[in-house]
């Protein structure tokens, strides 16, 4: 029978890796598909922004809570660790996973704000936005496609934080199991 601590290890490691996949999927799949649809099918910036905003809202709604639960599990494992190495690895894993929050605020915040402002402005002028023209009345030197490409890059980096946490947690678990033999 598995111990509670063993189950927490599984939840923490899987949570970090799963969250990384969730975040990275937007960078590697969703946004490239939007950009390709824009260029290949002539979809309007309004529609592209509307879909991006829904993707963003789903991530914004769930990712911080998943990161908090995963980080809490790693912090608990660090607190329970009797040896210094797993304690440091689990502690670093907790910080790495929770690092998506300050990373998002500091590095992605300006791009998120521009895209959300542009999306709101496009929503207000929906009848004219369906012609496939990019906005000219939002103060920004970047086009919608450039902003989305930049967001894609930043989100790709963001996805590495929980992945690093999951890998560090796995190393800590393996180190702990090796020491138990």
Curated annotation (Swiss-Prot):
Endocrocin is specifically produced in conidia. The chain crosses the membrane at residues 1-21, 65-81, 88-108, 153-173. Its main location: membrane. Its EC number is 1.-.-.-. It holds the Pfam family Anthrone_oxy. It comes from the Eukaryota. Endocrocin and related anthraquinones compounds have interesting activities for medicinal uses, including anti-inflammatory activity. Induction: Expression is positively regulated by the transcription factors brlA and laeA. Disruption phenotype: Leads to unstable anthrone production and abolishes the production of endocrocin. One of its GO terms (cellular component) is membrane. It is a multi-pass membrane protein. One of its GO terms (biological process) is endocrocin biosynthetic process. It is an enzyme of class 1 (oxidoreductase). InterPro entries: Anthrone_oxy. GO terms for molecular function: monooxygenase activity. It is found in: Membrane. Keywords: Membrane, Monooxygenase, Oxidoreductase, Transmembrane, Transmembrane helix. Belongs to the anthrone oxygenase family. Anthrone oxygenase; part of the gene cluster that mediates the biosynthesis of endocrocin, a simple anthraquinone interesting for many biotechnological applications. The pathway begins with the synthesis of atrochrysone thioester by the polyketide synthase (PKS) encA. The atrochrysone carboxyl ACP thioesterase encB then breaks the thioester bond and releases the atrochrysone carboxylic acid from encA. The atrochrysone carboxylic acid is then converted to endocrocin anthrone which is further oxidized into endocrocin by the anthrone oxygenase encC. This is Anthrone oxygenase encC. It comes from Aspergillus fumigatus (strain ATCC MYA-4609 / CBS 101355 / FGSC A1100 / Af293).
């Amino acid at each position: 029978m598995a111990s509670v601590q063993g189950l927490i290890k599984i939840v923490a490691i899987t949570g970090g890796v799963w969250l990384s996949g969730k975040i990275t999927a937007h960078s590697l799949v969703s946004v490239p598909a939007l950009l390709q649809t824009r260029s290949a099918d002539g979809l309007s910036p309004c529609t592209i922004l509307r879909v991006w905003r829904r993707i963003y809202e789903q991530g914004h709604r769930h990712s911080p809570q998943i990161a908090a639960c995963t980080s809490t599990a790693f912090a608990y494992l660090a607190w329970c660790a009797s040896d210094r190495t797993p304690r440091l690895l689990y502690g670093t894993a907790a910080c790495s996973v929770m690092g998506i929050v300050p990373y998002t605020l500091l590095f992605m915040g300006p791009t998120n704000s521009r895209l959300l402002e542009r999306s709101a402005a496009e929503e207000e002028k929906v009848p004219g936005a369906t012609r496939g023209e990019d906005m000219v009345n939002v103060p920004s030197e970047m086009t919608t496609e450039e902003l989305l490409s930049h967001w894609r890059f930043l989100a790709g980096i963001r996805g590495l934080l929980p992945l690093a946490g999951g890998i560090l947690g796995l190393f800590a678990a393996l180190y702990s199991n090796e020491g138990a033999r």
